[in-house]
Amino acid sequence: WWADWAAPGRGPYDDPDIMAAVAKFVEVGTKSLACPDRSPAADLAVIIDEPSFLYEGLSRTLDWPLIYRQRHWGLSRTGAPYDLYLLDDLEKLPRPYRCYLFLNAFHVSAAQRKIIDSKICRDGALVAWSYMNGAISDTLHPDNMSDLIGMRFRWDMTAWSLNMLLTGFDHPITQD
């Protein structure tokens, strides 16, 4: 999708070469809609949760390290294709994935926990969790994370900055 918000004849897309490229993109996109098999090819499903933003502080400083950094700096370095889904869409996934990465699922309802347990955590799938996933159910408590993830947690309220990044870029799998 593209939009040229400027007045006619003065926008950044007002260039014959750019518009020729846009026309080609539209042509390719339109043809792809007629492909018989348009199912996802990725083995990794990345899950984000829009309502979890409501449980952040007003500064919303968690979005940058948990979502944007991971998507633009971490996941892009893996070279592995991934599909992006909302936590609310877990029941509608088109097929099982080999790996699931939950980026910001702070609040996970009882119904979502059942779906994760019955549909996601099965058949040898790898499930990776980031910061505070499942911490909120009816209340905020580390036992909520333990129930969801299957590990014991305790909290340390020491203030610190949140940085979760892929490191070790000398390893062959993460080299440019």
PLM feature segments, named:
Residues F106-Q175:
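A glycine-rich, often tryptophan-bearing local segment used as a flexible ligand/cofactor-contacting loop or short
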Residues G74-L93:
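A short, well-structured beta->alpha microelement
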Residues I47-P51, L87-D88, L103-F106, S130-N133:
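Structural motif
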Residues P94-F106, M145:
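Short, well-ordered secondary-structure micro-motifs within conserved domains or adaptor modules
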Residues E27-L33, Y85-D89, K114:
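Alpha-helical scaffolding within the catalytic cores
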Residues L44, Y82, Y100:
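Conserved, mostly hydrophobic/aromatic
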Residues P8-G11, F53-E56, K92, S109, ...:
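Short catalytic/ligand-binding loop motif for oxyanion handling, primarily in non-cytosolic enzymes
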Residues W1-Q70, W155-D176:
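Hydrophobic targeting/anchoring helices
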